[in-house]
Regions:
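Beta-strand-centric surfaces of beta-sandwich/beta-rich domains
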Residues: 1-236
């Protein structure tokens, strides 16, 4: 598939913008749906821009998939995406981690990618924060007792909500992150799946994990699973 371009712009609480390569001409139409799954009326406005031109023969079909586990089953890895079949490219993900434990780091788990049916991970990252281009607990300053958020073009820990960051690992915090594989593309020929451990210094944890994964396939594919029920579709 063609090298993708993916850029997000988020204004706190009110605006979500996405700039993404898609090719509706390959299917003659592009349908976008905004569904209100709550019990109150909401105000929505939108604008869609596009460019029409020649489509590369190698251009893939864009896919996105939402998944959550609230909480992650203790001792079992969180599945970011699985069941992808065919030839394609994994683009990246947006990720949220909500703390349910205390007095321990949550980033000791290893993100793992299994490409083309391998029983062992083809790519095994050294830790959760390392995958999101951080290190050492996202630069948690022991003296200042404060996390260091950052926002880059391809990766970032752009926000921390919940208790004040001076609580360090003891607070009920929510970490919001993203990672896009543009400079380090991830290709697959037959299949792809990705998992992420939920581990701390003292062992397995039971935090709330939420993610949206993005990928391209050479032909349209079914999503791995349906969305959660309305009552479960909540960021805790």
């Amino acid at each position: 598939s063609q090298e993708p371009v993916s850029t997000w712009a988020v204004t706190k609480d009110v605006t979500f913008s996405l700039f993404q390569d898609t090719y509706p001409e390959k299917t003659e139409k592009l349908t976008m749906v905004m569904e209100n799954r709550g019990d109150k009326e909401q105000t929505l406005y939108y604008m869609v821009e596009g460019w029409k031109g020649d489509i590369p023969a190698s251009a893939g079909y864009f896919h996105a998939f939402y998944r959550q586990e609230h909480p992650v089953q203790k001792g079992r890895a969180y599945t970011v995406v699985d069941g992808l079949e065919g030839k394609g490219q994994f683009v990246g993900l947006c990720f949220a981690a909500g703390m349910n434990g205390h007095n321990t780091c949550w980033v000791e788990g290893e993100p793992k990618m299994y490409i083309d049916g391998g029983q062992h991970p083809t790519i095994n990252y050294t830790g959760t924060e390392d995958y999101f281009c951080g290190s050492y607990g996202f630069g948690n300053d022991i003296l200042q007792k404060q996390y260091q958020t950052f926002s880059g073009l391809y990766a970032g820990l752009y926000a921390i909500t919940g208790n004040d960051s001076s609580e360090m690992y003891n607070g009920q915090q929510r970490f919001l992150l993203y990672r896009f594989h543009i400079q380090d593309p991830v290709y697959f020929s037959k299949s792809f799946r990705m998992t992420m451990d939920n581990l701390g210094w003292t062992g397995p944890r039971y935090d709330d994990y939420t993610s949206v994964a993005y990928w391209y396939l050479e032909r349209p594919g079914a999503l791995p699973a349906p969305l959660p029920a309305d009552g479960e579709l909540v960021m805790r």
